[in-house]
Every structure is written in C-alpha cells, then in structure tokens.
Amino acid sequence: DSDSVDLLQRQPKRPGSTVSWWHLIQSSSDSAATAASWFVSPSLGDDADRQGLIEGLRNGVIDAVAVHALPLDDEECLLPPDQRQRGVAGHQHVLPALWQALVVTRGWSAEELWDILSFKPATLLGRTPEQLALGSNRWLLFDPEQTWTPSRDDPSASKAANQPWLHRAVKGKVVACGLRTPKSHCG
C-alpha cells in the first residue's frame, strides 16, 4: 500500500521490492476485486493505495512488477477462503491490463512498461536482462488494439478457475511470441 511505499522511500539503503500486477490495476472498491474464485495477499488497498504503488514504481522506489501467478482448479476454488491458496492466475492478462492502466491511462511509454516487466525484474534477480538479437526466440508481438474475450475453452488459454476477466472483453493481446512452437499461439 502507499504506506509501504513511504516506508521504503525513507530507507537509507532500500531493499529490492516488487509489486503484484493485480495491485496496480484493481483496488478494494472494484467489483472484480470481490470475485469469489480468488483472493490475493496482501489484500488490495483502496484507490489511493493503488496510486501510491504506481507512483512508487514509476519513481523507482519499487523496482519491478511481479506476476506471482497461482492457478487453482474448480475444486480448490470451492474451498472456504481461509483454506485455499491466495493468488490470481492469468499470465495472458498482465501485459494488456498494464498497457491499459499505465500506458493508455497514465501516459507511460512502452519502454517504461517493458522496463518494469522485463529488464528490472531480471536485474533484481541478478540475471542479465534480455536483448533482442537476430535468431533469438526471446521476443513477442503485442497488439494493443486487439480485443479478445478470455475463455477456458480456448486451447491456448489457462484452465485456471481463478483468473480475472473470464468471458469479458479485454483490449490488447500478445498475438505471437518466439518461445512457442509453431503449433501453439501466445494469446
């Protein structure tokens, strides 16, 4: 939450830190935040907390975005909340959601978004950030204008029961990537 960002900012030597993508696009006041099929930890804050996290990420107090995907099946989602794992699934939602929330709504550049999604997480983990090179399979093609509807029936989609926005139109989609075989797609 925004108090945590303030605490990090006051540290003379800041520890590495990440924020979940879901905390950047949802708040406790959003209807999607009350879905019965998933819960996140820490819980979502209010809109001021979300704004504080976004500002902390943009000004470097928070280093990177974390996905922390945790797919649950239908049975697991039937358990009472205190008896199941906390988390939200849906890698395919991350780039479209953050594109809309940060690039479209808040004016971030594509480079700033990619930095917090790829380069800074690699650096935080002590890995060499990826570079686009001829012959590399480390690439993706994202269409920010393509609208699609996530469904568990899609052969390339997650089968997790705890993913947000099932059967709801989403704008922006990864349409191809080098890490997939020719038989599968990325969306």
List the predicted regions and their residue ranges.
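Histidine/acidic residue-rich metal-binding segments in metalloenzymes
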Residues: 1-65
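Glycine/Thr-rich phosphate-binding loops of Rossmann-like dinucleotide-binding domains
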Residues: 5, 25, 73-75, 149-150
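Short amphipathic alpha-helical segments
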Residues: 8-10, 77-79, 153-154
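Residue-level signal for inorganic ion chemistry
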Residues: 18, 68, 98, 181
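Short, glycine/acidic-enriched loop or turn micro-motifs at the edges of active sites
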Residues: 21, 71, 146
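His/Asp/Glu-enriched, well-ordered alpha-helical/loop segment
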Residues: 37, 58-59, 64, 70-142
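A short acidic, glycine-rich active-site loop
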Residues: 38-49, 85-89, 164-170
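C-terminal cap of metal-dependent C-N hydrolases
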Residues: 83, 136-187
